[in-house]
Each structure stands twice: as structure tokens, then as C-alpha cells.
């Protein structure tokens, strides 16, 4: 504190009685961005409304849930999709169970929010305005206690206590800006399967991915309740939200398992991310309340005009109130308008919002791959006792061929490999096993938020594809399932589920075609007899009940041209690393 006091003394000429324009502008931008982040965060959370402190996500082990549904521990009786909540567009962004677009909005706005936060913090220290919220003496604590007692007595400290904030406000603002925000930033990356797989040590700092997710949620909840106090507090939670966000990407988590271990595991990071969101919600409520309860005339004059109330005229104060009302109306209009604009044309929104995130993805997460196997992140002791599923095996209406093969224990099943190849080939399960096998213990990451660890046995995709020779123009691999996609976004009849695999994933050692799970033949409910595993990505790329592999020229020529069934119907992104 002595060093800070010396710095404060040296910066004594800084005017703290007025609020410079840059401070007011960055605060307003932050206010708008936080609204977007909270509402899109609710959309993501509603997809799996449960929070855990462990990676296994076993029903009953959650520490917080927003559903009354009871989940059977018999795999397949209750799916993760059954657990999804449908929120109104007035509540979440965009609403109506559109998690794909919710994730897109969350990613895009996070980047804008970070840039605005960087500008704010840089100017805060560059201009000496940091003294507004950084304590420089230990006396801050007894002074804050005195302020708290005044508030608890339902009284308001006199205006002399505010320079420009009283001790309690200053302490709270410091906590939000320099403690909670970094915690939110720190837990955010852990939501990425790529990040968590690449930096498992980082995840362990937060115990595990689900703990990080829970912390992230609590940060959001705190903000929602606290918003009324002061927008400045946002930047304590912000860094933590940012840090845990990438861990939600399977690619990031798999590429940096050490980073994931900083948060203990991926679910711990997810919880931390939630805690940050909760913190923001609490902060917003508290901030707004104090602005209009504790000396509102002074607060409004400072926020809108940057001037002291005693130095302005009645007309100027009226102008400040008008500006405040307009600002709030504009913010609410943007929040609600974004939902209805998104829902008015789902495909357009998917292309625009996900497309806007691509430059940042190309510089960051898309450069990473999971290294869970190479780093031996998990052992057999880590295998989950329960694994969620979000689809059910093919029905007779979807594939009579599959039902016939299943009746004879898949003895006549042959995997087809064709498309743009010189000669198509097919393989039985035994023939695939004869080509070679690998055993990987990895964490499955669903874009809904749940995780599970299992031991997978199969053949590396790149080794299998050596059995055929692609022709010129073969750039992507398409995996097609016996099963159908669960729904289509525009109500069309469902079609066989497919996903297109990027060449960079095909060469990944953690990309395998699995026929075994936990030392047993792959159970039907988890995709037997064959399923794709691509642990740098979210689960929707890992096709179950694989019927055929084929080389294609361009994924834009298949289906709706988005790269797979979940991209076509669920409006997800082709590269599922984040």
C-alpha cells in the first residue's frame, strides 16, 4: 500500500472530481456489451442447465441446476437434448433454444468487450484515473465497514464521503475490476475443448473444467445482481471470464491440458465462468440501484456530463437526465433487437455472426490441437462412471439396413470408403482391427457444456485413409451416419446425419474411428459399431453409427453448405474447436 500511496501522491494533480469523456464512453460501451454477454450466456447455460465441480457430470453430482428434471443413469433413457431449456427472446440472446447462435454472439461480443476493456484499463493508468478505484491505504477497510453500517441502517453516507466514491464503493469497484474480471477471463478459455486439451495444467489451477464453468457462471450471477453499483467493477470478473472461455473449446482444452489444470478441470472452469457471469449480474443490479439511491443528482451529472452537480445549471441537469434515459432505451433496444433480428433469418445470422469471429479464431484457437493423449492428461482412474448422450440409435424408419445389421450383431457390416478416390473400398470391423489400433483416454466435450472421460479403442483416421488414394480435388472428408439429425432448423424432413472433417483434423493423432469404449465393444447408445472421435473439437463433429466415409471437393457442396448436420440444423460453426 505504501508504494501505491506514493504513486497517488505523485499523481496528485489528476482531477478526480469530474469524469473525462473516455471514461464515460467506455463505461457505456461496457454496459451494452455486458448485456449481450449475459443474455447470450443464459442461452448457452440453458442448453445444459446444470453446474458441477467435477469432469464426470454424473446426474446428482451437480451443485446447482435450473431444472426439475430427474435424469436416469441408464444411458440413453434421458438425453442431454431432453434437458435443454427454451428461453424467450426477451430473456436470452437469441432465445428459442438456438444455442448455436447464442455461442456465436457470445464469441463475437467477447472480442469487442475485451478491446473496450483494454482501452479502459490503459487510459485508467495512463491518465492517473486509477486512483478512483485502487485503494492506497489500509484504512480503506475500516472506512468501508463504517460505510456498510450506514447502508445497513438504511441510511446514505453524506456527500463528503465520496471522493468520488466512498470507501465501500471503492473497495467493491477494485474487486470487480482487478479480481473478478481477471477470474472470468481466466476461466473462459477452459470452455474450449482444444484449449483444455492443449493446456491441462492450466485447467487444474481451477480444479477441472466444470469447476471453471461454475466459477464463470457465478461471476455472471454476481454481475447481474451487482450491476446497479458501478460498471467499473466489471473488470475484475472480465479477465476470469476470458481465461475460462477458451477451455470450452475441445481443441484448446486438448491442445493445452496444462492450462486447463490451472482451473483443475474443464467443468471447474465452466463453473468459474458461470460464477463470473453471476458476479456481473449482481454487480449490474447493485450499481444501478446505488446510482439512483445514493446522491442520484451527483451521479447523473458525473455520468452524463462529466461535471460536478454543483457546477451545472438546472437546464444542464435536465439534459443529463434526458441523455441517461436515451442511453438506457438505446441499450435495451439493442439487446432485444439483436434477438429478434437473429431469429428473423437464422441462416443469415449464422453466416454473419460466426463469420465475424473468423479473423480472431484464425489467429488463436484454430491454430491449436488437443494433446490429451501425448501429455497423458487422463488415466483409467479418471474414467467417468456415467456418460451423457444427446441422440438415440437409428430407428427402422431412419435405416432398415442398420436394424438388419444389428439383429445379426453387425457381422455383415462393412464400412465404405469412397467418393473422390481411385478405387472405393470397404472393411469389416475385424478387418479394421487388423489394420492397427490405438487406445486413447480423453475427455469428450459437448458444446452444451457437459463433459465425460472415457477410454476409446480404434484406428487413427489417417492410418485408415492410407488404404485409399484420393483423386485430384479431394479436399475434405465426409462421415455419414445410419442415424438421422434430430431436427432441421426450418422444419424439413430429417436426413442422415453427416459431418465434414477438415484436413487439419484428419492428421490429428486424437482423431480416430472407434469400435471400443472402456475395454468393451462400443455400446450402441454411444455410436456402435463405429463412431468418429475428434477430441480437438466439440462432440457434434464426432459422428455416431458411421456408415460411410468419402472424400469430397468442398463441404459447401453438401447439404446446406455449412459443413455438417449440426451446422446445417443447429447453426453451429464448421470448425468446432471453440
Language-model segments: residues:
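Short, well-structured alpha-helical interface segments that form or flank functional binding sites
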Residues: 110, 166, 170, 174-177, ...
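His-enriched metal-coordination microenvironments in redox/metal-binding proteins
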Residues: 106, 169-177, 216, 273, ...
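A glycine-rich, hydrophobic loop/mini-helix early in the fold
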Residues: 403-456
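Alpha-helical support elements that line or immediately flank enzyme active sites
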Residues: 419, 458-466
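Helix N-cap / beta->alpha transition motif
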Residues: 428, 457-460, 490, 502
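Short acidic (Asp/Glu) patches
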Residues: 94-99, 428-430, 462
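Extended, aromatic/histidine-rich regions of cofactor-dependent oxidoreductases associated
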Residues: 2-11, 295-408, 415, 467-578
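Membrane-embedded alpha-helical bundles that constitute the cytochrome b-like, heme-associated redox core
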Residues: 1-365
